[in-house]
Amino acid sequence: MSQHVMFNAVLSSHPALFIQGEWRIGNGVSFEKQDPMSQQRLWQARAADHTDVTLACHAARAAFPAWARASLEQRATVIQQFAALLEQHKQSLARTISLETSKPYWETLTEVQAMIGKVAISLQAYQTRTGHSQTPMGDSMSVLRHRPHGVLAVFGPYNFPGHLPNGHIVPALLAGNTVVFKPSELTPWTAEETVKLWQQAGIPDGVLNLVQGGRETGEALAAQPDIDGLLFTGSAHTGYHLHRQLAGQPEKMLALEMGGNNALIVEQVKDRDAVVNLAIQSAFISAGQRCTCSRRLLVKTGAEGDAFLLRFTAVAQALRIGRWDEQPAPFMGAVISSQAAERMLAAQQHLLLLGGESLLNMTRPDSQSALLTPGIIDITNISEVPDEEYFGPLVSVIRYTDFTEALKIANQTRFGLAVGLVSEDRQQFEQLLLEARAGIVNWNKPLTGASSAAPFGGVGASGNHRPSAFYAADYCAWPMASLECEHLTLPATLSPGISFDLPKV
């Protein structure tokens, strides 16, 4: 480990909870974060127990009235100061994310840049999606306003520990909500460093609170009567659990952004290396740990498809993998933990036992590291393919005969996050748009490509119809409709059955 890393690593238990503007030591169990590459300890602290979580929610509730009544300009000033601090500390935060996730430094720099860009996008989205509008109606005015929910719990994932929670926290605060943030227990350090920047930005006490920990902390937060909503990004398994936990509480807003078993259809291969590059980016970027990564690669049967697969396999085998700060820079690093690496290897073995054919065997070169090499497995001949999101560098190949069959296969999943098409036939893309059950449908672009100026989310097991990104503003505030008239006068025409022509008493 470099001297720089040793200097910055948090190697002893410390105050890692941020509640009511103060850093506190948790009352829960001690837990630690290890470097996925070296397994050396990076961070250690005590988790938040039920008492800590309750305290954080009470702090957020107490801070809500003043924050909600502050002007939009006042709230935006704090958030813009946070963006300025992100710019100032971009490199150090990117290094922290790289250490925790093993993502290459070039990639985590883009993550912090996305966090910065989220502020301007969120301001635009707030005004576009949930702003103030009025329409004349005779002698009155129809006015639409939006009001914050109150206290929102934000659950962050580990694959983008800066960007994805930021995509909930920024619009939530902008709308006037207060927040209790529970990051993944696999990326506590990134969360701590991010909240320190919010503190420097001048966020008022209690407006943003941080509780660290695993499942017990998360369940305690979801069970809090003081929260008015919960914003979650993570696995379908955890999302379903939270949905059940909040069942029978329609008064609480629940936004679930979950994973996908995404299909990339390779219908035409005009420029072979261009298609291979797109497929590599779709399958293996971030070591396959993006919810939009292609888990299923649908390749047309025939010589063109055969040649594409040979080239795809060769390029995947030659991908540079390694430590985040190595030079030349690697394309991808390790998966998030040794346990995640073991799950991926078990998934590959399961598919092979079902009858899959390995085109490129995923391996773990060092048992003391979570680094995996890319894997490609042909599952065309498996009769009952598991409909699972294997969150790592493993892609399944399915051969098909015609486009109609490809569309059918693409939709054979309980998920509905992303689907993509490689073809120069516009009519095929139009057909895909009509038949796809997915929130993101890309044409000749990587599945992992998305715009912050568009909604991000899916259907089925990929979410509960509350897409994030530009549409996050929608669930961070509720609409208030008013009919308004400054002066009350008796209508010239009364409703039938009403008369004021009464005998004098």
Curated annotation (Swiss-Prot):
GO terms for biological process: arginine catabolic process to glutamate; arginine catabolic process to succinate. It catalyses: N-succinyl-L-glutamate 5-semialdehyde + NAD(+) + H2O = N-succinyl-L-glutamate + NADH + 2 H(+). NAD(+) binds at residues 234-239. GO terms for molecular function: succinylglutamate-semialdehyde dehydrogenase activity. It comes from the Bacteria. The active site is at 257, 291. Its EC number is 1.2.1.71. It is an enzyme of class 1 (oxidoreductase). The keyword NAD applies. Pathway: Amino-acid degradation; L-arginine degradation via AST pathway; L-glutamate and succinate from L-arginine: step 4/5. The keyword NAD applies. PROSITE patterns: ALDEHYDE_DEHYDR_CYS, ALDEHYDE_DEHYDR_GLU. Disulfide bonds: none annotated. Keywords: Arginine metabolism, NAD, Oxidoreductase. Belongs to the aldehyde dehydrogenase family. AstD subfamily. Catalyzes the NAD-dependent reduction of succinylglutamate semialdehyde into succinylglutamate. This is N-succinylglutamate 5-semialdehyde dehydrogenase. It comes from Yersinia pestis.
